[in-house]
């Protein structure tokens, strides 16, 4: 029990376990009261010492457990918060990249549709040119 708690008096194991023995003469034929009282006092004092020590230990144990639980909770909360923040930053970055990619794909799709329309128009004009007569039909009569 070497731990000291601030605000409480220091106790040593020796102070709690020291007993002062008093020696007295016994009268023969009389029952010794000392033995009975000692047994009662021993039980009472050891119970008091044990209960005081157990209260002190339990109190100290409770404090240490609460402090450790708070420390664990804080570190777990900090870890979770940092993990969530870094994951959310990565998600935001990925989302921005996806938006840029989507915009690029939409622009490419629009450009491809315009190119397809232009190619179709060109094909129609080429077909018109090939099928039409450039020169009018000239009929030449033979002179006889």
Curated annotation (Swiss-Prot):
Residues 31-40 have a biased composition (Acidic residues). The gene is Blos3. Component of the biogenesis of lysosome-related organelles complex-1 (BLOC-1) composed of Blos1, Blos2, Blos3, Blos4, Dysb, Muted, Pldn and Snapin. Residues 1-48 are annotated as: Disordered. Keywords: Coiled coil. This is Biogenesis of lysosome-related organelles complex 1 subunit 3. It comes from Drosophila melanogaster. One of its GO terms (cellular component) is BLOC-1 complex. Belongs to the BLOC1S3 family. Residues 102-133 form a coiled coil. Component of the biogenesis of lysosome-related organelles complex-1 (BLOC-1) involved in pigment granule biogenesis. The lineage of its organism: Eukaryota, Metazoa, Ecdysozoa, Arthropoda, Hexapoda.
